[in-house]
Amino acid sequence: MSAFPPPPIPAPDASRVARVEPTPDVVRGILELGDRARADDGVAPFNEQTRLLLGTEDGPALLVVQGTDGRPIGAAVAARGDGGIEAEIVVDPARRRRGVGRALLDAVLAEAAGSPVSVWAHGDHPGARALAAATGLDRARELLQLRASVAEARTGLGERPMPAGLALSSFTADDADDWVALNARAFASHPEQGRMTRGDLDDRVAEPWFDPALLLLARDADGRLAGFHWLKVEGGQAEVYVLGVDPDRAARGLGSALLAAGLDLLAARGLDEVDLYVEADNAPALALYRRAAFRDAAVDVQYRRA
């Protein structure tokens, strides 16, 4: 071991942030950077939609700070939508507290050119809170990650039969348009989920983790879709991916019945633990999940500047 300390790493400034094209090598480098951050922080810096859009035509802007070895030490993924810019930022754990995050956030603000900016901080990292405060971004939204034992969650729900007149089936390609329509109704006020298109659904169906048997549909006697429970199992980890109910059938026990049916599927497959994500201000959904013994595991925070 050397008796001499390593030389200090020069603090980058905004001039070192480069807007890069989404070549396969660039996308790979950003994803590997995200993996390093996830291993250190315990949470992924990019959400699923960002990962799906990376490298696509007309995808998000990619802003990168390169290290001396050519690998990115920081990156921002900034997507422009109707409400302005929405971004996610990641910094290599070994290069934090050296100005990389501030340089990237300044570059995102410049990219926005005065339009509203939203930045997600997955895991509510203290560094992200400090950076938001220093740049005038307000805490605008919280997304809770909840976790439960499959057995405890199922016990907590108790007997939850499907409401009369409804029957369960598994997803097929013929169900796609009905699912998109009901998802839009069930999540009409949700800024991301409610905007899912048929193309977005097709992208997820094409993912290696997708299993049609884990997308449960509840239909009435006339074939109308009343609700659904979509489960995701990847790498041995189960997730309540999305659970939706027709607003006309809200508060009638369908959500509880769908959750119970999904948990039964997970138990039959020998899965012990399940996660889910829910908006912190969604009181009805939180009440259901608390009854099912879900507990807080992490929180994602969206900071915003109007």
Curated annotation (Swiss-Prot):
EC number(s) stated in the UniProt entry for this protein: 2.3.1.189
Pfam families (alphabetical): Acetyltransf_1 (PF00583)
One example of a Gene Ontology biological process annotation: mycothiol biosynthetic process
Residues the record lists as binding acetyl-CoA 2: 243-245, 250-256
Catalytic reaction list: 1D-myo-inositol 2-(L-cysteinylamino)-2-deoxy-alpha-D-glucopyranoside + acetyl-CoA = mycothiol + CoA + H(+)
InterPro entries: Acyl_CoA_acyltransferase, GNAT_dom, MshD_Acetyltransferase, Mycothiol_AcTrfase
N-acetyltransferase domain: residues covered: 17-163, 166-306
Residues the record lists as binding acetyl-CoA 1: 89-91
Keywords: Acyltransferase, Repeat, Transferase
Protein residues bound to 1D-myo-inositol 2-(L-cysteinylamino)-2-deoxy-alpha-D-glucopyranoside: 48, 192, 232, 239, 277
Top EC class of this enzyme: transferase
GO molecular function annotation: mycothiol synthase activity; protein-N-terminal-alanine acetyltransferase activity
Keyword check for Hydrolase: no
Assembly description: Monomer.
Primary role: Catalyzes the transfer of acetyl from acetyl-CoA to desacetylmycothiol (Cys-GlcN-Ins) to form mycothiol.
Family indicated by similarity: Belongs to the acetyltransferase family. MshD subfamily.
NCBIfam families: mycothiol_MshD (TIGR03448)
Protein name: Mycothiol acetyltransferase
